């Protein structure tokens, strides 16, 4: 009887751990940039020139987060008026390589913990100084992205789109 209870407990914990490693449904959808807080200051802290900051701030930005057709895998798309990045078929906690919005190859890892989806990037051409993590939460049916650099915290709010992808 004790063996069955132990086996049941182990299976239950394994199932709960698996369920906790999934992105909740409320995150899935297409989101369009609505507003930003400290975005210019954040870019300046990263050393981005004034002219380039103005170009970046003018860009239309949408994010699409979806389940991939393969169970346990996901897709994230960053759609901008300048360049798109399409990260398809990634798994939580597994690092993959892809091109970032800056045109440079990145190592990227997505994780989900305590209601927060994180997207961690390391540029392959400067791994010692380039680590960045973006944190996503859902607040009032909006996707909220948080970034920090040199003590500057930036937040960007994306409204859920009612249109098709």
From Swiss-Prot:
Molecular-function GO terms, alphabetical: lipid binding
Tissue-level expression: Expressed in presumptive hypodermal cells by the comma stage and in posterior body wall muscle cells by the two-fold stage. From L1 to adult stages, expression continues in body wall muscle cells adjacent to the pseudocoelom, while hypodermal expression is extinguished.
Cellular-component GO terms for this entry: extracellular region
InterPro entries (UniProt xref): Calycin, Fatty_acid-bd, Lbp1-4
Signal peptide: 1-19
Alphabetical UniProt keywords: Lipid-binding, Secreted, Signal, Transport
Keyword check for Lipid metabolism: no
Keyword Endoplasmic reticulum: no
Main location: secreted
Cell location: Secreted
Domain of life: Eukaryota
Comment text on domains: Forms a beta-barrel structure that accommodates hydrophobic ligands in its interior.
PANTHER family, A to Z: FATTY ACID-BINDING PROTEIN HOMOLOG 1-RELATED-RELATED, FATTY ACID-BINDING PROTEIN HOMOLOG 3
Function noted in UniProt: May play a role in sequestering potentially toxic fatty acids and their peroxidation products, or it may be involved in the maintenance of the impermeable lipid layer of the eggshell.
Family indicated by similarity: Belongs to the calycin superfamily. Fatty-acid binding protein (FABP) family.
UniProt protein name: Fatty acid-binding protein homolog 3
Protein species of origin: Caenorhabditis elegans
Encoding gene per record: lbp-3
């Amino acid at each position: 009887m004790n063996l069955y209870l132990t086996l049941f407990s182990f299976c239950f914990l394994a199932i709960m751990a698996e369920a906790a490693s999934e992105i909740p449904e409320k995150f899935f959808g297409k989101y369009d940039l609505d507003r930003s807080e400290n975005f210019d200051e954040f870019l300046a802290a990263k050393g981005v020139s004034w002219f380039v900051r103005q170009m970046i701030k003018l860009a239309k930005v949408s994010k699409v987060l979806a389940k991939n057709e393969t169970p346990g895998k996901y897709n994230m798309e960053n759609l901008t008026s300048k360049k798109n990045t399409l990260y398809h078929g990634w798994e939580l906690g597994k690092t993959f390589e892809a091109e970032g919005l800056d045109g440079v190859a990145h190592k990227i890892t997505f994780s989900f913990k305590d209601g927060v989806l994180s997207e961690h990037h390391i540029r392959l051409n400067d791994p010692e100084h380039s680590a960045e993590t973006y944190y996503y939460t859902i607040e009032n049916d909006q996707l909220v992205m948080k970034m920090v650099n040199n003590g500057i915290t930036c937040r960007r709010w994306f409204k859920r789109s009612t249109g098709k992808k």
